[in-house]
Curated annotation (Swiss-Prot):
Disulfide bonds: none annotated. May participate in the inhibition of type I interferon induction through inhibition of the host mitochondrial antiviral signaling protein MAVS. The knockout of PB2-S1 has no detectable effects on laboratory infected mice. It comes from the Viruses. InterPro entries: Flu_PB2_2nd, Flu_PB2_CAP-bd, Flu_PB2_middle, Flu_PB2_N, PB2_helical. It comes from Influenza A virus (strain A/Duck/Germany/1949 H10N7). GO terms for cellular component: host cell cytosol; host cell mitochondrion. This is PB2-S1. The keyword Hydrolase does not apply. The gene is PB2. Keywords: Host cytoplasm, Host mitochondrion.
């Protein structure tokens, strides 16, 4: 009552009212920001002023029996005063030091089992070899990569059920462990973690790391398997790269590799059977990789590869709308087209029946050593922005894009007959015939393409028909970017401040 009276008196003074209403804290938004919710809004500041206090930590009362009131230097470790608002004790940071030095020790047998991913990482790094360092312009492409080596391939839901069963077996809630891998992992982990004294929540977090694939969309210049991604910060910078050989394999990378090989074999065998779809599905169901059914792996594994995508599509799973041509993965990022058969005449007067894509489209092209953005209309290349490791890689990308554009001047640049065959001695389709022809020799293609004067745009340069760089002229519609061009992620929202494409600001 006394306090309320005092506050009333204060409020009756005009100065008090002025201070409270005219200062910036009167903004309701600011008050709300710092007082609503339990989330700490300024952790660094909070930590600073807490640590300036003598007893910034609260602990259970049992601490008084376990820790002496003073340490060897006579400094007070805990205060007899209770924490306001709870029946806990106020404790000094010195108590933590005392506990770490003199507190009880426990068996460490479970640590390597729970923190297995970390122990394995240390081993991989110990046995890996680093060096030498090369200084050169790094062409990085943002790709979806696997960031935790050594994981199983369970879905988030499957992993959640396994974790609940292992860590909190007595909790209520229906858990259905159906897949072979779920049952095996649960049995194995229950045995490993018997009498484990590590906090259950920590065990749950670590299990999640071991069981679920985690992916991120990161700029990468070299290897994309998870054992390379875990050392990305050591192997590539903006203008340098360090050679690295991992000190061990991990099963998820092996599975990804095996999946690609298995899918390719299955697709190859299915194409020659009487009923390709039925035969492909039958093979997918009867194949196992590392003891796990291939169909289960296909459901979880995000590997993007042509044969893997064919198997996924056959099973009715969603696949990304990318396709391969000339060693590049094309992803349409905007526009649309319809296909129409058209007969065209080559420079050798040979008739080719090609499927023309009518309409405006934009693509990203991603290859091993070069990447590009391609904008095209019906049988016309509008713009190609390419970046690559070297002249050869850039030339490869330009040839593929020129053929893909289906321009008339490309078809007229053909000299001689097109009669390329595949390994089974079957004639290749016309688009691949054209591609093979120009991959052998692109001189006429580049000469016939035409050149244009270019504007001076930062980070961009022209390229002449003999593949030498130029700041004045360039092949029509073609520019070379010094920065990488990112692989497009359809699943990730593009933040406005970090453009997916290194040169979008220039277009």
């Amino acid at each position: 009552m006394e306090r309320i009276k005092e506050l009333r008196d204060l409020m009756s003074q005009s100065r008090t009212r002025e201070i409270l209403t005219k200062t910036t804290v009167d903004h309701m938004a600011i008050i709300k920001k710092y007082t609503s919710g339990r989330q700490e809004k300024n952790p660094a500041l909070r930590m600073k002023w807490m640590m300036a206090m003598k007893y910034p930590i609260t602990a259970d009362k049992r601490i008084m029996e376990m820790i002496p009131e003073r340490n060897e230097q006579g400094q007070t470790l805990w205060s007899k005063t209770n924490d306001a608002g709870s029946d806990r004790v106020m404790v000094s940071p010195l108590a933590v030091t005392w506990w770490n030095r003199n507190g009880p020790t426990t068996s460490t047998v479970h640590y390597p089992k729970v923190y297995k991913p970390y122990f394995e990482k240390v081993e991989r790094l110990k046995h890996g070899t680093f060096g030498p360092v090369h200084f050169r312009n790094q062409v990085k492409i943002r790709r979806r990569v696997d960031i935790n080596p050594g994981h199983a391939d369970l879905s988030a839901k499957e992993a959640q059920d396994v974790i609940m069963e292992v860590v909190f077996p007595n909790e209520v809630g229906a858990r259905i462990l159906t897949s072979e891998s779920q049952l095996t992992i649960t049995k194995e982990k229950k045995e490993e973690l018997q009498n484990c004294k590590i906090a259950p929540l920590m065990v749950a977090y670590m299990l999640e790391r071991e069981l679920v694939r985690k992916t991120r969309f990161l700029p990468v210049a070299g290897g994309t398997s998870s054992v390379y991604i875990e050392v990305l910060h050591l192997t590539q910078g903006t203008c340098w790269e360090q050679m690295y050989t991992p000190g061990g394999e991990v099963r998820n990378d092996d599975v990804d590799q095996s999946l690609i090989i298995a899918a390719r074999n299955i697709v190859r065998r299915a194409t020659v059977s009487a009923d390709p779809l039925a035969s492909l599905l039958e093979m997918c169901h009867s194949t196992q990789i590392g003891g796990i059914r291939m169909v289960d792996i296909l459901r979880q594994n995000p590997t993007e590869e042509q044969a893997v995508d064919i198997c996924k599509a056959a099973m009715g799973l969603r696949i990304s709308s990318s396709f391969s041509f000339g060693g590049f993965t094309f992803k349409r990022t905007s526009g649309s087209s319809v296909k129409r058969e058209e007969e065209v005449l080559t420079g050798n007067l040979q008739t080719l029946k090609i499927r023309v894509h009518e309409g405006y489209e934009e693509f990203t092209m991603v290859g091993r050593r070069a990447t590009a953005i391609l904008r095209k209309a019906t049988r016309r290349l509008i713009q190609l922005i390419v970046s690559g490791r070297d002249e050869q890689s850039i030339a490869e990308a330009i040839i593929v894009a020129m053929v893909f554009s289906q321009e008339d001047c490309m078809i007229k640049a053909v000299r001689g007959d097109l009669n390329f065959v595949n390994r089974a001695n079957q004639r290749l389709n016309p688009m691949h015939q054209l591609l093979r022809h120009f991959q052998k020799d692109a001189k006429v293609l580049f000469q016939n393409w035409g050149i244009e004067p270019i504007d001076n745009v930062m980070g961009m340069i022209g390229i002449l028909p003999d593949m030498t760089p130029s700041t004045e002229m360039s092949l029509r519609g073609v520019r070379v970017s010094k920065m990488g061009v990112d692989e497009y992620s359809s699943t990730e929202r593009v933040q406005p401040h970090r453009s997916r494409v290194g040169c979008s600001s220039l277009l």
